[in-house]
Amino acid sequence: QRLGHQWAVGHLM
């Protein structure tokens, strides 16, 4: 998994 993906998911959600 990518760190950027985690924060990105929170922003999109």
Swiss-Prot record:
Paired cysteines (S-S): none
Modified residues (Methionine amide): 13
Pfam name, any one: Bombesin
Assigned GO CC terms: extracellular region
Tissue specificity annotation: Expressed by the skin glands.
GO biological process: defense response; neuropeptide signaling pathway; regulation of insulin secretion
Compartment(s): Secreted
InterPro entries linked to this entry: Bombesin (IPR000874)
GO molecular function per UniProt: hormone activity
Sorted UniProt keywords: Amidation, Amphibian defense peptide, Pyrrolidone carboxylic acid, Secreted
Sequence positions bearing Pyrrolidone carboxylic acid: 1
Function, as annotated: Possesses insulin-releasing activity.
Entry's family note: Belongs to the bombesin/neuromedin-B/ranatensin family.
Name used for this protein in its record: Bombesin-like peptide 1
The organism of origin for this protein: Bombina variegata
